[in-house]
Amino acid sequence: MVGACYMQAFLEQGHSLVGLCELQPNAAVADAVQAAGAQVHAAPGAWLAEADVVVSAVFGTVARSLFEACLPHLRDGVVYVDMTTADPQEMRECGELARRVAQGRAVHFVDVAITGAVNLGGSKTPLLVAGGKAGFVQELFLPLGGSVRVVGGQPGDAAALKLLRSIYTKGAEALAVECLVTAQQMGLREQLHAVLQDIDETPLRTLMESMVRTHIPHSARRRNEVAEARQQMARNGLAPIALTAVEALFADTARAHAVQPFTGTSTDEAIDWLGSHVLASRP
């Protein structure tokens, strides 16, 4: 879906299509490729040498292997745009691979992270871009109408930021599922939105930093509140999953604070203490 979306958007901007690599294209995509005067290919090959820009939009688990398969066929000066949700370290390794294995050719690997739902935003979905040719890629995508932000000079920087964002957004999504389902069960869904209004009115950065800054000294009391919220879910025939993990984090913080009291007052001090005493990996 992502590849077809951006293919169509680039065609509408007047770019030429060299070809599409797709094992099982649907009829609409195949027709669009044919209408653009190109062909659908089952694998990377010599046809890639005609491209100035190659866009990869596959699953993150195969991002590196696909790049390795494309690399021998890429022309000097090509920009390879990886739009997969791949591991940041793999993106860095691909960037290094492009520098080492290009055999005298300049191959520019650029990491592009999609930070929204393409099925909703289409080619206007916000993007994060990182790599030596990030500025070029930004200029390439900006005419499509979305936000395109350069976030780093090394491949992997965009992917890393997207995954950091996912800690918050996917965690919030999981809690939203449990919260709204419980509210619906209790007949309080509309009233819930009203009592959450103060959160709507608080800038996200202010909210996050306040939560972290006050988390440690209030962890024991807040853990009890989370336990009561879990019991309320259970009384309504629901089995908490995300909220159980939330309670465990508050309990771990409370235990650590009892052993090694936190005496700081700033967000930075709280982050350092939590990283050392609560979230650090244990052998």
Predicted regions and their residues:
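Hydrophobic beta-strand scaffold residues
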Residues: 17, 40, 108-110, 148, ...
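Rossmann-fold NAD(P) dinucleotide-binding segment
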Residues: 44-112
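Glycine- and other small-residue-rich loops at beta-strand/loop junctions that grip anionic moieties
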Residues: 22, 56-59, 83-84, 152-153, ...
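Rossmann-fold dinucleotide-binding core
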Residues: 63, 86-170
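Short, well-ordered alpha-helix to beta-strand connector turns
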Residues: 14, 37, 50-51, 77, ...
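NAD(P)+-binding Rossmann beta1-loop-alpha1 motif at the extreme N-terminus of oxidoreductases
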Residues: 1-49
